[in-house]
Amino acid sequence: MKRYFLVLCLLLLLPVLCSCGEEEVRTIKIYNCVDYIDEAVLDDFVDYFYEKHGERIDYIYDTFETNESMYNTIRTGKTDYDLCCPSDYMIQKMIREDRVEKFDFEQYNLDTYFENCSPYLLDLFEQNGWTEYAACYMWGTLGLIYNPSELASKVDEEDYTVESWEDFLKPEFKGMASLKDSVRDAYCVASIMVHKDELSKVDSSSKEYNTLIQDVINRVSDEDIEKVSNKLREIKSNIYGLEVDSAKGDIVTGKIAMNLAWSGDAVYSIDLAEEAGIELRYTVPNEGGNVWFDGWVMPKGADKELAQEFINFLSLPEIAAQNMEEIGYTSSIAGDAIYNLIDEWYGVASNELYVEECQALYDEDPTIENKELLDEAIAYLDEATYTEVDLTYFFKGTLSEEYLTGDKVIVTIDDSYMGRQFTTQYPDLDTLNRCGVMQDFDEQNETVLQMWINVKANKASVILIVSLISFVTLAILLVLYSKRSYFARKRRLNKK
C-alpha cells in the first residue's frame, strides 16, 4: 500500500520537477494593423534576439481593422500588449491620455532606429514632442489618384493633369470620382477647399504656408465644422460615392476615374493598372494635403526591452526593405538597402534587370516570341529617359559614401515612374511643405463624427427613417387603441 502511495506521489510531482529544469520564455505581444508587416520577420526577430542576447523568446501577433478598435481594446486594460501601431492622431490621443510608456533610453536603447530612420521624419517627431513615446513605422501623403485619359476625354483634351481639389466639383467629372468614407481624410480635403482663398495669398514654398496648412486642416470650431459640412455635401452631390477599400480596384476597372487615396494604396492601384496597360497618376494638389504616419508605441506595462529591441530590428534597412516589398507602403527607414530597392524598382537598375530577365528567358526557351520580348527590353533600355532626383532630405546621414554625390543623395529615376509610383512614395520637399499633420480633434471629436454621419445620410434615407418611425408609432397607437376598446367592451358586457 505504501509502495503505491509513493508511486502516486512521484507521478504527481513529476510535472513540477520537470518544470524546474525549463527556462521561462518571455513573450513579446504585438498589436498591428492587418496586412501591415511581412510576418516572416516575426520569426526572424526571435532568431535575431537569441543571437544578440542568448535568450529564447516567443511572440504573439494580433491584428486590428481600425485605430478605434485598437484604442478600445487598449483602453479596457484587459490586454498586455508590448507594442501597438496606431496612426498619428491616435498616437497623440494615447499620449495625452497617458496610455503609453516613454521609451527607456538609459537601460535600453533605440540606436538602430535613430541611425536609420529618415532625418526628415525624426525632425517631424521631435518638433511635435513624440520622440519619447513613438517610433515612426510607415509614412506617406493623402492625395488624388486619377486616370488622365478618362478625365481628358470629358474636357476634350489630349491629356489632363489634376492640380486642385476643386476637380471634385467639376461638372464635367460628375459621377467619376469617389471619396474615402473616412471622417478625418474627408475633413482634411474639405477644410482645404473651404479656406482656398486664404491659402492662395501665401507662397506655397514658404515656411509660412506650411504653418498655415497645418492650421487649416485642424480647424474644428463649430463654425469651421459647419463650413466643412456644407462643402462635403457639395462634393458628395458630384461624386460617384463613398468607399472604404473598393476604389483600389474600381479605378483600375474604370468604374471611377479619380479617388481620394493614401499614397500606399495609390501605388498598389498604379501597379495593378500597369499590368492591364492602363496609366494612372497620383498627385498632392497644389493647395496641399496631409502627411501621415503610423508608429510603434508601448502601452502601459509593456516589456520595454523586448519592445525596443523589436523596433530596432524593424529599423535594419534590409528588414525595412523586406517589409516594403511585402506590404507596398513606404518605410520610415532609409539606408543602403532602401536606396538599392528604389533603384531596383524605379531606376536604371530596374530596366537593366528586366533585360537580364528577358535574356535568361530567351536562353532557356529561344522562341520567336521570347526574342521579340528581349529586343523590346533592350530597345526600351536604350531609349528610356531619366530624371535625377535629390533625396537628400530623406537619406541624409544614413548611407555609405559610395551612394553620395558630393554631400547630396541623388537617385536616377526612369521618367515613366515620375508622377506615378516613385513620386507617390517619395514626394519632393516642395510637396511636403504644403502638407500638414492632422491632430486629434480632442473635445470636438464627437461633433466632427456626428457631422460626417449627417453628411453621409442622404435625403432619401432620412425620409425613409422618418416614415419608418411614423409607421411604428402609428402601429403602436393602433394596438393600444385596440386593447383599450377591447377592455372597454369587456367592462360593458360584465356590467350587463
What are these regions (language model features)?
Residues 237-301, 343, 350:
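Extracytoplasmic/periplasmic substrate-binding proteins
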Residues 472-486:
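Alpha-helical transmembrane segments
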Residues 23-97, 113, 460-464:
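Early extracytoplasmic/lumenal segment of secretory-pathway proteins
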Residues 487-496:
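Cytoplasmic C-terminal tails of single-pass
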Residues 16-19:
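C-terminal motif of bacterial Sec signal peptides marking the signal peptidase cleavage site
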Residues 454-472:
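Juxtamembrane/start-of-transmembrane alpha-helix segments at the extracytoplasmic/lumenal side
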Residues 294-426, 492:
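Mature extracytoplasmic/periplasmic domains
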Residues 32-40, 87, 95-255, 269:
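Extracytoplasmic ligand-binding site segments that recognize negatively charged/polar headgroups
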